[in-house]
UniProtKB/Swiss-Prot annotation:
Enzyme class: hydrolase
Protein name: Tubulin alpha-2 chain
Stated family: Belongs to the tubulin family.
Cofactor(s) required, per the database record: Mg(2+)
Quaternary assembly: Dimer of alpha and beta chains. A typical microtubule is a hollow water-filled tube with an outer diameter of 25 nm and an inner diameter of 15 nM. Alpha-beta heterodimers associate head-to-tail to form protofilaments running lengthwise along the microtubule wall with the beta-tubulin subunit facing the microtubule plus end conferring a structural polarity. Microtubules usually have 13 protofilaments but different protofilament numbers can be found in some organisms and specialized cells.
Annotated GO MF terms: GTP binding; hydrolase activity; metal ion binding; structural constituent of cytoskeleton
N6-acetyllysine modified-residue sites: K40
Disordered, as annotated region: 432-451
Organism: Homarus americanus (American lobster)
GO terms for biological process, alphabetical: microtubule-based process
InterPro entries in alphabetical order: Alpha_tubulin, Tub_FtsZ_C, Tubulin, Tubulin/FtsZ-like_C, Tubulin/FtsZ_2-layer-sand-dom, Tubulin/FtsZ_GTPase_sf, Tubulin_C, Tubulin_CS
Ligand binding (GTP): Q11, E71, S140, G144, T145, T179, N206, N228
EC number: 3.6.5.-
Length: 451
């Protein structure tokens, strides 16, 4: 088996977890108490959904997941919510005082008291796996627990499970709206710490999703539940190939191989289509060509940036539902002729394609329409450097005046960690810039002609 352990850290991570597991349960026909009426092979653990669920002797399915937050309120909602019987009580770990939006509290002061408890729980989950493939880590960059504790945990996971891949689904601070003033600080500190510990990080920004909910789903005032359900669909598409049999299956390590050209450049952009409300879907049936084309619209992306200004290094298209390879080939050919998609010149313009015959499922009564086919595009583009540049600019404005720095120093950090993190991000921006520069310019011409 190629099992996958999900780790949900902090409020954002836990709430994304709620949406994801709600959707997985619907997709696999698992009831909120973990029973699965359709499962004929009770106790036999070779079904493909067992990558995400363990099966007990009595036929109960338990998620391979750990929920961690340094304050109790959000996890208490899981403990008393509709899925309270689904999770093992020891998988829900909450502390007494929160990280107060402070990376240093999450990473040093409070985080260090909980990290061993969490690792112990993860170890128990890992022991139940026959061939653990890796970890999916859900968190936000802006919060104290999501930034501080998650980075501490990832450092420790690298030590204990060195070879296992770690993929992140991370909420990136939105350009305009922020939940806290110090989000930029937390984000650069955590990015700096986890850059070498994460293999691939799918960033999502709340504002981009907020706009999608307003524009495509006609939700006038989207709540976090609306946002998380949309994120759930994306995560479900990314993990569908691990949970279902399919024609072209893609596993975790395959994502990295195809999306990450250099270890540091591991922040793919995610786009999902079709995102339409039930009223609209009633009148239109979207073809493979239309949903593929929609993926290249900046408006459908999960991070605010413009790929038309950047170059693509790699591109994965994950289809699910009623899709045949012939249509996909035609759609991609069409996109290549119509759109101005520019690939870096050192990379072949190939698209990695995955097809899963399981149609997309939606949560009943939610905003998204039930459709027969959907696609999730993961692309590594140099345009995402715009997002880093925006963040760095905000940090510079605050750090020039040393605003809010005393909160971090008071929790045991040193001021030089800020400048180190800022330098590392400057290097990251430069890395993206260099990757996009054409290699065959200037003096390389003679060598380029040899081939």
């Amino acid at each position: 088996m190629r099992e996958c352990i999900s780790i949900h850290v902090g409020q954002a991570g836990v709430q994304m977890g709620n949406s994801c597991w709600e959707l997985y349960c619907l997709e696999h026909g698992i009831q909120p108490d973990g029973q699965m009426p359709s499962d004929k092979t009770v106790g036999v653990c070779n079904d493909s959904f067992n990558t995400f669920f363990t099966e007990t002797g009595s036929g109960k399915h338990v998620p391979r997941a750990v929920f961690v937050d340094l304050e109790p309120s959000v996890i208490d909602e899981v403990r008393s919510g509709i899925y309270r019987q689904l999770f093992h009580p020891e998988q829900l770990i909450s502390g007494k005082e929160d990280a107060a939006n402070n990376y240093a509290r999450g990473h040093y002061t409070i985080g260090k008291e909980y990290v061993d408890i969490v690792l112990d729980r993860i170890r128990k989950l890992a022991d139940q796996c026959t061939g653990l493939q890796g970890f999916l880590i859900f968190r936000s960059f802006g919060g104290g627990t999501g930034s501080g504790f998650a980075s501490l945990l990832m450092e420790r996971l690298s030590v204990e499970y060195g070879k296992k891949s770690k993929l992140e689904i991370a909420i990136y601070p939105a350009p305009q709206s922020a939940t806290s003033v110090v989000e930029p600080y937390n984000s650069i500190l955590t990015t700096h710490t986890t850059l070498e510990h994460s293999d691939c990080c799918f960033m999502v920004d709340n504002e981009a999703i907020f706009d999608i909910c307003q524009r495509n789903l006609d939700v006038s005032r989207p709540t976090y539940t609306n946002l998380n359900r949309l994120i759930g669909q994306i995560v479900s598409s990314i993990t569908a190939s691990l949970r279902f049999e399919g024609a072209l299956n893609v596993d975790l390590t395959e994502f990295q191989t195809n999306l990450v050209p250099y270890p540091r450049i591991h922040f793919p952009l995610t786009t999902y289509s079709p995102i339409i409300s039930a009223e609209k879907a009633y009148h239109e049936q979207l073809s493979v060509g239309e949903i593929t084309s929609a993926c290249f619209e900046p408006a459908n992306q999960m991070v605010k940036c413009d790929p038309r200004h950047g170059k693509y290094m790699a591109c994965c298209l994950l289809y699910r539902g009623d899709v045949v390879p012939k249509d996909v080939t035609a759609s991609i050919a069409n996109v290549k002729t119509k759109r101005t998609i520019q690939f870096v010149d050192w990379c072949p313009t190939g698209f990695k394609v995955g097809i899963n015959y399981q149609p997309p499922t939606v949560v009943p009564g939610a905003d998204l329409a039930k459709v027969s086919r959907a696609v999730c595009m993961l692309s590594n583009t140099t345009a995402i450097a715009e997002a880093w540049a925006r963040l760095d600019h905000k940090v510079d404005l605050m750090y020039a005046k040393r605003a809010f720095v005393h909160w971090y120093v008071g929790e045991g950090m040193e001021e030089r960690q800020f400048s180190e993190a800022r330098e590392d991000l400057a290097t990251l921006e430069k890395d993206y810039e260099e990757v996009g520069i054409d290699t065959a310019d200037g003096e390389d011409d003679e060598e380029a002609n040899d081939y």
